[in-house]
Amino acid sequence: MEDFVRQCFNPMIVELAEKAMKEYGEDLKIETNKFAAICTHLEVCFMYSDFHFINEQGESIVVELDDPNALLKHRFEIIEGRDRTMAWTVVNSICNTTGAEKPKFLPDLYDYKENRFIEIGVTRREVHIYYLEKANKIKSENTHIHIFSFTGEEMATKADYTLDEESRARIKTRLFTIRQEMANRGLWDSFRQSERGEETIEERFEITGTMRRLADQSLPPNFSCLENFRAYVDGFEPNGCIEGKLSQMSKEVNARIEPFLKTTPRPIRLPDGPPCFQRSKFLLMDALKLSIEDPSHEGEGIPLYDAIKCMRTFFGWKEPYIVKPHEKGINPNYLLSWKQVLAELQDIENEEKIPRTKNMKKTSQLKWALGENMAPEKVDFDNCRDISDLKQYDSDEPELRSLSSWIQNEFNKACELTDSIWIELDEIGEDVAPIEYIASMRRNYFTAEVSHCRATEYIMKGVYINTALLNASCAAMDDFQLIPMISKCRTKEGRRKTNLYGFIIKGRSHLRNDTDVVNFVSMEFSLTDPRLEPHKWEKYCVLEIGDMLIRSAIGQMSRPMFLYVRTNGTSKIKMKWGMEMRRCLLQSLQQIESMIEAESSVKEKDMTKDFFENKSETWPIGESPKGVEEGSIGKVCRTLLAKSVFNSLYASPQLEGFSAESRKLLLVVQALRDNLEPGTFDLGGLYEAIEECLINDPWVLLNASWFNSFLTHALR
């Protein structure tokens, strides 16, 4: 059949049919009858239009190709054969210029003389059956239907055949010739039997039994059964008077649909106020590690043993003092807490055998820092019923904060490469099926791009800290346990490395519910001077605890070493998600995979290798005030990973709300870019919903700023 089609039809028609099948994901090597049907339909549409013009008096005339008057206006606009986006653009343009009602489905032609869209049908069955199917699907009196069959029959709306008899006879003769040619090659019977009707999903699937009863019970008010609701939905014109439809649905709804134009959207308003502060559970770009390479000490792998070994690598300890106090805290208590950690670690080293875990003495400074006995007493509600002025205590509205540059710097740093390898994916057996081979290849390429990434370090650090804290919270509920903040990696040469970032001391942790809070004090090493960006460190008390020799291009230099101390809290559910931060790798890999799939479907072959090995190609990474930023595929992988990791590190209700609400605006803007002529109602309400999520969260504020950059460049 494929050979017949290529011989029988004009190469341009064959090419258009191939494109159409590719657009719908159909294989012309398998669906050969469909290939023939599409070519036939295209040819009939072109023949319908051929030689028909409108003269200066507005009359329809037939003019042969070589006629010198062929510069007359074409009577028919051909819509069939264009890709969907262009076809809808043509339809929208016709509707705008002629005032014609926009059809629900893409028609085949537009008749400028009769001012109507035309749906052409070519059937191998009875013309009246096919006509009814078309009419039932289109459900519009404004689209004219004209059906031709291979037997010479035809049927049209109100028996109005549009064209003169000679033009229609030419089409019928061509269809009869195609049928004869197919029959001569033994292809006709298969072609005739392969035609499917204009079915809809509802006609194919009957809902019966329990599902039917559930459907009848689940209807909106005022509908007695599924049929009534279906009839209402089928008659609901999406491009009709939406305002009227909304008022039908509810008396409270009163909406005016406004066209959404390039000039309609305004930037999202970011809050004013003091700069936002760092609120992650551990330091990110400012963290400093004390490391040991190729650890082989006694008890290697036991966190406390590893921590003591890492602490011994540093010789620049000095008497600690406060360099940046916490505005609201009792700062001497933070200083005393660090001194207590040093003293108790020294005590451990003096013991014959180092214990596996260390519970801190419950000193006054730790009790204060961990909020011991600070929780208000819980009283049974029944005992309070008689108190006349019983009310919930007033809570202050959170203070609005403005966007600060440090969060963009944090994100940029998270996308960078480090000199260590942070993940090694386990071997998962031989690839058997081709899909497994492709999946492994993609995973390996992706891993190579992100294994050195700083965002991957944050994942492993987050997994370790949350796992250790949850374990300690369950195993030592009443103890102030000392938990080293550790990560493990490999150097570029493949040597194992253990890193210590600092310590956590956890408070009492009787966690019954998922949201019950465990308090902890974090103490983290850093070389960042807090006085450079004091607003970032609002929640911290920062001590100077030593001097570190740093090797640089100009030789060794001494830098002060700081300890960032703060009180913090988390819950079982937050720790559970923190332990699963490796999911971020999967999410970003899936995003990359969808890019590869899109490219592969266009090129009709797996593009994984080309994608990762074509170093000259650049891809869009994101928006900045300068415009669309582009980079290598590796940069795209690392940026997507960093976004996913930051969504985890800075998870909050503000982020949930902003993501959900801004997505609605994003979809409308994308519809505008795709020339789909979107309309909106209560756009002000949508902006309000977006902006009420912009309070004080640094990551949400940065995302809002990125969104504004996107709006600026998307609507140019």
UniProtKB/Swiss-Prot annotation:
PTM (free text): Phosphorylated on serines and threonines by host kinases, including human casein kinase II.
Compartments where found: Host cytoplasm; Host nucleus
Keyword Phosphoprotein included in the entry's annotation: yes
Entry's EC annotation: 3.1.-.-
Co-factor: note: Binds 2 manganese ions per subunit.
Residues the record lists as binding Mn(2+) 2: 80, 108
Major subcellular site: host cell
Metal-binding in keyword set: yes
Short sequence motif named Nuclear localization signal 2 (NLS2), residue ranges: 184-247
Binding site for Mn(2+) 1: 41, 108, 119-120
GO biological process, one term: DNA-templated transcription
Cofactor: Mn(2+)
Domain of life of the source: Viruses
Gene Ontology MF annotations: endonuclease activity; metal ion binding; RNA binding
HAMAP family, sorted: INFV_PA
Description of how the protein assembles with itself and partners: Influenza RNA polymerase is composed of three subunits: PB1, PB2 and PA. Interacts (via C-terminus) with PB1 (via N-terminus).
Family under the similarity heading: Belongs to the influenza viruses PA family.
Task performed by this protein: Plays an essential role in viral RNA transcription and replication by forming the heterotrimeric polymerase complex together with PB1 and PB2 subunits. The complex transcribes viral mRNAs by using a unique mechanism called cap-snatching. It consists in the hijacking and cleavage of host capped pre-mRNAs. These short capped RNAs are then used as primers for viral mRNAs. The PB2 subunit is responsible for the binding of the 5' cap of cellular pre-mRNAs which are subsequently cleaved after 10-13 nucleotides by the PA subunit that carries the endonuclease activity.
Protein name, per record: Polymerase acidic protein
Protein's organism: Influenza A virus (strain A/Memphis/1/1971 H3N2)
